[in-house]
Amino acid sequence: LFWALKGGGGGSFGVVTRLTLRTHALPEFFGAVFGEITAASNEAWRALVARFVDFYSTSLFNAHWGETVSLKDGKTLKLSMVFQGLDQAQAQAAWAPFFAWVRERKEYSFAEPAVMAIPARHFWNPQFFQKHAPGLTTMDARPGASPDHHFWTGDGEQAGWFIHGYQSAWLPSGLLAPQQQALLVDALCAAAAQWDVALHFNKGIAGAPKAALDATRDTAMNPAVLDAFALAIIAGGGGPAFPGMPGATVDEERARRSATRIRSAMDALLKAAPNAGAYLSESDYFQPRWQDAYWGGNYARLARIKAAVDPGGLFFVHHGVGSEDWSADGFTRVKPG
């Protein structure tokens, strides 16, 4: 049961009332690299994506780097990377070859990137961010809110949003091999022509230290995460839509159009990674092969645990373990128990 709760979708198995957290020693510094690079043509755009993929494979595919790089607005590469275990000078040195390559070419517009390092123990201190990096986080403005309540400013748009489409895929590290990079680059560019693509490097475990790989291997998650250098997320939505929510509006035509483009973008990306797994918590509500996508070879064991601890099917989750035995609303058993 403990194994199943670690990645199997906890709500499918019971109610967790208490847990113990494992803590880890902090490095001296955490830090971030921010920037945007826009290409002037399709040819320059593909060259930029190719250069970044090669740079990532040789310089960032390690335990120091994570978070995201996004392909957005057709021809813009947005950098939102974080690092740990490096100081600011080391982080700047790591990126210097890539930034020099961009600066040498007139087909790219590029504002100077921001590279910052902060003491790791201040990473959750909102007052530190307000003083040293204003705008990076936003304070909770509700009356009476605790002074330690803050959130990443870029996440603010998710409050109350209505999701039109949400797709994810684990991208295998083999795509970073020199002979496979062209396939990956073509797929990324084709997908980004349809919709923005975010590569979440911290959510792929390949390149992590052995201890982290071993700990992840001892979970119910799709084992594909162990060999993934990134989780690709292609998603979009709009403002509040449910009745009673402030400012609720419904634009069904726009929502369906967005959903179609999001699916098309993921279809294009999956040409480089057919049958890629997906992350349970950030994935397609309509995932057709959800058992394999979410859990791979672990699903059979999860199903046996579900049958043992919840034979009556009290706990039902859409596309959760054992949900194929029930109607879509979870109230009618459609397969014998």
Describe the role of every protein-language-model region.
Residues 1-337:
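Soluble FAD-dependent oxygen oxidases
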